[in-house]
Swiss-Prot record:
Belongs to the P-Pant transferase superfamily. AcpS family. It catalyses: apo-[ACP] + CoA = holo-[ACP] + adenosine 3',5'-bisphosphate + H(+). Transmembrane segments: none annotated. Its EC number is 2.7.8.7. Its cofactor is Mg(2+). This is Holo-[acyl-carrier-protein] synthase. It comes from Vibrio campbellii (strain ATCC BAA-1116). GO terms for biological process: fatty acid biosynthetic process. Keywords: Cytoplasm, Fatty acid biosynthesis, Fatty acid metabolism, Lipid biosynthesis, Lipid metabolism, Magnesium, Metal-binding, Transferase. NCBIfam families: acpS (TIGR00516), pantethn_trn (TIGR00556). Coiled coil: none annotated. One of its GO terms (cellular component) is cytoplasm. Disulfide bonds: none annotated.
Length: 126
């Protein structure tokens, strides 16, 4: 197995919370997939959740080498968790097509947050 792509992103939670406060749910829906929007609606710390998902999607788009451009959108990435809480990143749409063309067979995701920041790292592996 070889590393085909690596991306890291850090998001300031307060900045995301302010944007969410200004624009509300439309801002969240611009970033989150349908499954993530359902979970988002149930949470108390919405800004923290959104900041972590934003960081993941930016990191994943960097690992693809495209950023959020060239047909790749935030909705092409969905974060869920396995039965142990491990984060799982699922690709769809153009992001999935690009990853397949790169030969990606394994996706690794790490997410962490502290008081002020959320950070994510994504590795695409053959």
């Amino acid at each position: 197995m070889a590393i085909l792509g690596l991306g890291t992103d850090i998001a300031e939670i307060e900045r995301i919370e302010k944007a969410l406060g200004r624009t509300g749910e439309p801002f969240a829906k611009r970033i989150l997939s349908e499954d993530e929007v359902i979970k988002f609606a149930e949470l108390k710390q919405k800004g923290r959740y959104l900041a972590k998902r934003f960081a993941v999607k930016e990191a994943a788009s960097k690992a693809l080498g495209t950023g959020i451009a060239k047909g790749v959108t935030f909705h092409d990435f969905t974060v869920s968790n396995d039965e142990f809480g491990k984060p799982i990143l699922t690709l769809s749409g153009v992001a999935k097509q690009i990853a397949e063309s790169m030969g990606v067979n394994h996706v690794h995701l790490s997410i962490s947050d502290e008081r002020h920041y959320a950070v994510a790292t994504v590795i695409f592996e053959s």
